[in-house]
From Swiss-Prot:
<feature type="topological domain" description="Cytoplasmic">
    <location>
        <begin position="52"/>
        <end position="57"/>
    </location>
</feature>
<dbReference type="Pfam" id="PF01036">
    <property type="entry name" value="Bac_rhodopsin"/>
</dbReference>
<feature type="transmembrane region" description="Helical; Name=Helix D">
    <location>
        <begin position="131"/>
        <end position="154"/>
    </location>
</feature>
<feature type="transmembrane region" description="Helical; Name=Helix B">
    <location>
        <begin position="58"/>
        <end position="81"/>
    </location>
</feature>
<keyword id="KW-0472">Membrane</keyword>
<comment type="function">
    <text>Light-driven chloride pump.</text>
</comment>
<dbReference type="InterPro" id="IPR001425">
    <property type="entry name" value="Arc/bac/fun_rhodopsins"/>
</dbReference>
<keyword id="KW-0600">Photoreceptor protein</keyword>
<keyword id="KW-0813">Transport</keyword>
<dbReference type="GO" id="GO:0009881">
    <property type="term" value="F:photoreceptor activity"/>
</dbReference>
<feature type="topological domain" description="Extracellular">
    <location>
        <begin position="217"/>
        <end position="225"/>
    </location>
</feature>
<feature type="transmembrane region" description="Helical; Name=Helix F">
    <location>
        <begin position="193"/>
        <end position="216"/>
    </location>
</feature>
<keyword id="KW-0406">Ion transport</keyword>
<feature type="transmembrane region" description="Helical; Name=Helix C">
    <location>
        <begin position="106"/>
        <end position="127"/>
    </location>
</feature>
<keyword id="KW-1003">Cell membrane</keyword>
<dbReference type="GO" id="GO:0007602">
    <property type="term" value="P:phototransduction"/>
</dbReference>
<dbReference type="GO" id="GO:0005216">
    <property type="term" value="F:monoatomic ion channel activity"/>
</dbReference>
Amino acid sequence: MTAASTTATTMLQATQSDVLQEIQSNFLLNSSIWVNIALAGVVILLFVAMGRDIESPRAKLIWVATMLVPLVSISSYAGLASGLTVGFLQMPPGHALAGQEVLSPWGRYLTWTFSTPMILLALGLLADTDIASLFTAITMDIGMCVTGLAAALITSSHLLRWVFYGISCAFFVAVLYVLLVQWPADAEAAGTSEIFGTLKILTVVLWLGYPILWALGSEGVALLSVGVTSWGYSGLDILAKYVFAFLLLRWVAANEGAVSGSGMSIGSGGAAPADD
């Protein structure tokens, strides 16, 4: 067995303590995780204070959805910081780092799988869309995150990594269709089109950054280091989650009357049923 293969085997069998040591030795990676944990803690306290006077059922649902975003994030980032959801992967032949062991913070996909549906739930409630449309957006989003995780973890085939990346992007296109085509009309009918439009653009622009980072980072063509990629993801998370949720919750707290309905309708957007 060569020295290179011995090193590779050792890294693949690395313990959580070994992974934690590797994280802590990488300043960019380590700082990108802890900054997010600190911000999530502050945001949780802020959102509790902002939502204390909200009373209407629909507004409360929006508040709960926005609260879950930093709650999920702080839990998931703590998993990254501990090394629990980070591991070494040997890149397959054809990859730019073929044969090398790459540190993979795959726990980010858990963050996105549980937090991004809450963002869509909050947006759907704001637009007062119908349950079928909301279900479509959330399930497509979960599919996007799960297939993205598969793309990141596959080590048997370089081609299959990109196949799953393409499938993930296809799910993303479905989410974009709902956000850009279906929900704006619902928001217009609900009287929330102005704030919905702002949050829609913020979400779409920032979410487009994730597949770009994947492609440029060590999971894709490896033009960016693990630490730089991690900071890119953390920066996007801060804007797409905490800033988004703050803008939404601030608007809801100040305009609760505009979202005073009881919640989702079944069938045709937020339109009220016709009288007999």
